């Protein structure tokens, strides 16, 4: 893939994630420069610091250095959670987060669900 096609491939994933967040009522937009020009993340929103990565392979792996960098970019005392979004060449897409953050979200969801039943 050329650099231009890689850039377009990345923009497509970022657009997809922004669209999904907006559909849920979350104010979200793509960051200028996709997180590399003074922006913390690829996508601006109030809940997550999102890093999007496209892979030109079928199998994907979580790059520990990218994950550590993403976690280190969370501002002190911020409630925003790091979220690493990966997509393979077949457009299968995964969201990776810290397991403790996942269980915190799940607990809140279940408490809300039980309160409405």
Predicted features by range, described:
Residues 1-117:
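Catalytic phosphate/metal-binding cores of nucleic-acid and nucleotide-processing enzymes, i.e., regions
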């Amino acid at each position: 893939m050329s650099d231009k096609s890689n850039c377009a491939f990345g923009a497509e994933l970022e657009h997809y994630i922004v669209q999904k967040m907006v559909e849920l009522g979350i104010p979200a937009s793509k960051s200028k420069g996709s997180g590399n020009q003074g922006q913390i993340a690829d996508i601006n929103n109030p809940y997550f610091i999102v890093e999007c990565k496209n892979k030109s392979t079928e199998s994907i792996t979580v790059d520990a250095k990218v994950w550590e960098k993403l976690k280190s970019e969370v501002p002190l005392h911020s409630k925003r959670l790091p979220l690493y979004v990966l997509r393979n060449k077949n457009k299968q897409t995964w969201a990776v987060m810290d397991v403790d953050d996942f269980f915190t979200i799940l607990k809140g969801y279940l408490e809300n669900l039980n309160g409405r039943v």
